[in-house]
Amino acid sequence: KIWTSSAHRADHIMVLTRTDPDAPKHRGISFLLCDMNTPGLTVNPIINMAGDHGFNMVTFDNVRVPKKNLVGEQNRGWYVGATLLDFERSGVDYSAGGRRVLEELTDYAKNNNQNGSLISDNPIMRNRLANLAIEVEVSRLISYNIAWMQGEGLVPNKESSMGKVVGTELQQHLSETGMQMLGLHGQLEPGSKYAPLEGRIEHMHLTNVSETIQAGTSEIQRNIIATRGLGLPRG
């Protein structure tokens, strides 16, 4: 299993395994919890472009998991995993982090010059910041709706996909705008005394590449919104 988030910190890992080889497609799969200390299980780190260790490759070599670790019904693990993804994709943190970065970029634009004038006077940058403010607010409202649904015991599905698309693309739009605003200095890493905003934008720009891929790509999320949200036929 590759690209496993935080496997180096976890004490258990979720496993979807086929328990009925004759069942079609999504059926015949069971959901198990496997202790990370189980013999035969190995975790190898994957370091991203920013130098962070968040992902891992987990290898299973003749690993045995007891029946008591079955979650839900046998052969219906796919549906447990799908519900789990709905919660993982909810992304209620995107708007909060996005608002902080937007405030930092706005403050930087108000107090720094580019080509002899304040960045905040540049119509292109003003337009970008205004669009980001709209995206942050949309992400916040979607997050609040998802949080309300979860509080009511409901499972957000298309709503989580909407939240993930808006939230993850917001992160990329923020870092792209930040890199353009900061210019060449925006490429400086955290720790450099010349790095604007302590190098956070450069770090964010490198880590955000995976945001629209992990937990289901933006293309997958849009398909979910189209089919389950709008009732459109599968392509």
Where are these regions (language model features)?
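Glycine-rich beta->alpha junctions and the first turn(s) of the following alpha-helix
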Residues: 35, 41-138, 211, 227
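C-terminal helix-coil-helix/basic helical segment that borders enzyme active sites and/or dimer interfaces
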Residues: 110-126, 137-193
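A structural signal for short secondary-structure junctions
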Residues: 51-52, 101, 172, 199, ...
